[in-house]
């Protein structure tokens, strides 16, 4: 999936769950802000929205007994592990990785739970 320019959520990433789509917007906004204002505070804020979203999304999956929950959780944990190594100012290659990961993760992984949560 191509990284949108400017980097922002759009309907191509809609999951059909309003609360998840709203949180996905915050992920896009967090990475965009980090690319524009590459500070320690912005990095911490970006990490925080990812942690919060993954917790919320995984909670919904668990509640619905989503069959791919453990696999999906592992993918989230792998991303957070990589993000945990980022230090401000974050290298552009790492920010780009985060953007590419997000635009690929939503259609490849999150779309699998459409109609199942």
Swiss-Prot record:
The keyword Transport applies. InterPro entries: Haemerythrin, Haemerythrin_Fe_BS, Hemerythrin, Hemerythrin-like, Hemerythrin-like_sf, Hemerythrin_metal-bd. Keywords: Iron, Metal-binding, Oxygen transport, Transport. It comes from the Eukaryota. Fe cation 2 binds at residues 57, 72, 76, 105, 110. The keyword Kinase does not apply. Fe cation 1 binds at residues 24, 53, 57, 110. PANTHER family: BACTERIOHEMERYTHRIN (PTHR37164:SF1). Belongs to the hemerythrin family. Octamer composed of two types of chains: alpha and beta. Hemerythrin is a respiratory protein in blood cells of certain marine worms. The oxygen-binding site in each chain contains two iron atoms. This is Hemerythrin subunit alpha. It comes from Lingula reevii (Inarticulated brachiopod).
């Amino acid at each position: 999936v191509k990284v949108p320019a400017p980097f922002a959520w759009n309907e191509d990433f809609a999951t059909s769950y309003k609360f998840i789509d709203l949180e996905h917007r915050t992920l896009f906004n967090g990475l965009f802000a980090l690319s524009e204002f590459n500070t320690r505070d912005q990095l911490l804020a970006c990490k925080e929205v990812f942690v919060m979203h993954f917790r919320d999304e995984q909670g919904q999956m668990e509640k619905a007994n989503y069959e791919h929950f453990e696999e999906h959780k592992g993918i989230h944990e792998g991303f957070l592990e990589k993000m945990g190594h980022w230090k401000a100012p974050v290298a552009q290659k790492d920010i780009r990785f985060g953007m590419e990961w997000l635009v690929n993760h939503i259609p490849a992984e999150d779309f699998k739970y459409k109609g199942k949560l």
